[in-house]
């Protein structure tokens, strides 16, 4: 028996964590889509953005450059783990693609594989659109589950460093008085 649990085994974010993460990823997606991410900063995301066609969206809330670069470092880890998951995340958050549009993309790149039919026989075939929709949903949830602790810790570390830096300045200015 495998020791790795699937999403259905309880490895999901709670509502509060999910809202926090999706808020930051949405701001990050708007930041990436705006073109503020330079190629020299993150070639992985910039390379992907160069391959897709941009669409006009109403003004979306965007994170600042410091937050964007911090999130980029965390999201780039997903690229090295699973490129398909990375692409699906960018489609969801940078291009604000619907679940169906993401599933259509995933269906287009899906390779035939051995699948169990309703009569419990194995057959080598391409997954259906419904299967792709379910898989996309699970892949995005899994990627978000992987990103959350790293992103939360990155923000926490950055905030504590910022507070320490400001406290050091306050100590120095109080000594001068």
Give a label for each model feature.
Residues 92-96:
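Short helix-to-turn junction characteristic of helix-turn-helix DNA-binding domains
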Residues 1-80, 108-113, 120-124, 128, ...:
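N-terminal interaction/assembly modules
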Residues 97-98, 127:
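Residue-level signal for the short linker/turn that defines the boundary of a DNA-recognition helix
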Residues 130, 134:
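Key DNA-contact positions within bacterial/archaeal DNA-binding proteins
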Residues 100-105, 110:
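Residues within the helices of the helix-turn-helix
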Residues 88-89:
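A short pre-motif secondary-structure segment
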């Amino acid at each position: 028996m495998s020791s790795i649990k699937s999403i259905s085994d309880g490895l999901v974010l709670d509502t509060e964590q999910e809202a926090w993460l999706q808020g930051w990823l949405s701001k990050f997606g708007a930041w990436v889509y705006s073109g503020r991410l330079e190629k020299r900063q993150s070639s992985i995301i910039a390379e992907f953005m160069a391959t897709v066609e941009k669409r006009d969206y109403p003004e979306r809330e965007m994170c600042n450059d410091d937050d964007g670069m911090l999130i980029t470092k965390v999201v780039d880890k997903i690229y090295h783990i699973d490129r398909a998951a990375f692409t699906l995340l960018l489609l969801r958050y940078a291009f604000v693609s619907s679940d169906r549009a993401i599933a259509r993309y995933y269906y287009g790149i899906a390779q035939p594989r051995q699948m169990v039919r309703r009569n419990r026989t194995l057959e080598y075939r391409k997954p259906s659109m419904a299967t792709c929709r379910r898989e996309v949903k699970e892949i995005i949830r899994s990627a978000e589950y992987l990103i959350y602790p790293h992103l939360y810790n990155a923000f926490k570390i950055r905030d504590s460093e910022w507070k320490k830096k400001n406290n050091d300045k306050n100590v120095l200015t109080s000594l001068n008085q």
